[in-house]
Amino acid sequence: MLKIKTHIVAVTMGVVALVLLCGSCASDRRMAAEPTVCVSIAPLKYVVKQLAGDMYEVETMTPAGVSPETYQPTPAQIAQLDECLAYIRVGTLGFENTTLRRITENVPHLYQINASATVPPLKDAAGDDPHAWTSPTSLKLMAQEIVRGLAHIDKHKADTLKVTLEAFETEMDSLDAQLSRQLEGAACRTFLIYHPALGYFARVYGLKQLAVEHDGKKPSAAYLAKLVKQCREEGVKVVFVEKEYDPELVAPIAKEIGAKVVVIDPLSDNPKQQFIEIAKALCQ
């Protein structure tokens, strides 16, 4: 009997040691020389890479070509978060809100950074506009939140991150000034877009965004007729359509109002270039 008890104790201690070892391994991976940071969308990856260079591996939760407003992370992705140093979210996306509970339940130690915490929120026809990253000023504010969070959890990199933040802020300020000058000369201050993803961009530069998609749904014939009339009255010359949508969705209305169709990618991993291309299209 004593031998059996001794064996049970030994096995139990072995299991405990294994659990502690696994936890220690996960912790070691999180604090490795090149730890992993997870972000919700590619534009946030761009910001992290501009700030941190190769200091972190950056994994993007939403696959390319998929809408982050409807995407649901897989169980494997959520499990992968156990090895991440931090999870950086936009803070406004549907899947972030629906899966946040699951994330905190399954990975309670995960440090989360709400990148849009200081971005003034914007309302649209469907409610809160989730596209908080779509302007240089928004990216600047997001970068500040990201550095604040990373410096808190990864203190030995704090000084370097603060230096790169200053450089990024200067870059975004310069881009903002460039776009402001450029868009002052835009003949038309109103544009049409299939999915209303440029509300923050429009707010910053005094533009007006009209959307084909209505309340997150395909538009009715009556709504389209009203939209065509408004576009004509306001002299709309550009119709944007996001990369993940078929341009044919806007081709008929563009033809009817005599506007050009321009494909954009608000989820690009180079949002700076996207802002430049959007301004260029509006000024041609």
Label each PLM-derived region with a short phrase.
Residues 11-22:
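Bacterial N-terminal signal peptides
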